[in-house]
């Protein structure tokens, strides 16, 4: 798809040639799904594996939690903003399979079973995601899918599941890991139901082998590369740095139907300052990441909600070109505490983020110029600059010789759209 668009003349040739990290070929899992990064809600980071509904009725992993989240997604504008997948993570299962080896939800916490929950979710226009594992057990120790890939794929399809997050704990050997992912992907396709497959294959395979992203993208709609996100700036920073260091292999793998997954958005929780929440949102959009929030939609500040629901920012993430953004080398090496990323958009536009990585002092000024962009060739004579974050502001046309002073808070980000 990338290649077709590039060759269709939608891009100036200088721009194409200047971009060493632009993918020349993307072959995503051929199920026609996730043509833009999946958006939704996933329980893990915020709710973990709380199974005691007596003591923790408000936050235990139960059908009630998901029904409440489904209602919030519809009535609080999340679905309208694009967040469609309501996803269950680990700890939904009963400790054993049933007499026919079929998976079953914990009967106390999910008395209606997953089918009933799927109906509830679908009735509201949402889609349901579920979690399983390629190995003998899930990471939290519940029954895994090993030896039951076909049966489990069929069970999920029968229940009306729309997305499977497929983890890699207890995988056995590398061959078993890779084979398990292939088999589950094929089995899901064979059910005939549209089920997005979200993998963790590269995360588990990386210590043992060089990850073949072409192959991963043939079997998965998205895949995790790094450790779990936590509710902290150090975690968000680490994910950004990892992604930037490996961008030459990660960026070409991404495209419609196939996404690198830097893990959940933790905006609206406890650990990130306002500026750090802006940074996570801006950079997850630049990275064309799945936007899967893990927060409590029943209790979220108006600011975090507005940030997560910002339609123009989401549009950067959901741009149909499906290009993953990348960190651009600075031409202002004397000041390496600013970090710039750019993401090509359709219609010959760019999204650009400017992060102040200094963790001391106050707002710092950067004299932004379009010549800082990759090879500086996207704007022929002048570009129209719109700031989308932290607040919306139109700066109008900027000549390529002109400089725009911008002030960025410590650990904060300015997100620009350049047309
Ligand atoms: C792994 C995954 C997490 C989460 C937990 C659940 O750590 O990477 O995202 O799914 O397992 O146990």
Which ranges hold each PLM region?
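N-terminal signal peptide
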Residues: 2-3, 13-32
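Structural recognition of the beta-strand scaffold that forms the well-ordered cores
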Residues: 38-43, 82-89, 127-132, 162-167, ...
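Solvent-exposed beta-hairpin/edge-strand motifs
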Residues: 371-392
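Glycan-recognition surfaces
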Residues: 148-151, 196-296
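Carbohydrate-binding surface patches
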Residues: 284-287, 292-294, 333-377
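C-terminal beta-strand-rich structural cap/linker in extracellular carbohydrate-active enzymes
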Residues: 396-419
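Aromatic-lined carbohydrate-binding/catalytic grooves of carbohydrate-active enzymes
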Residues: 46-55, 61-62, 67-173
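Catalytic cores of secreted or luminal carbohydrate-active enzymes
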Residues: 279-332
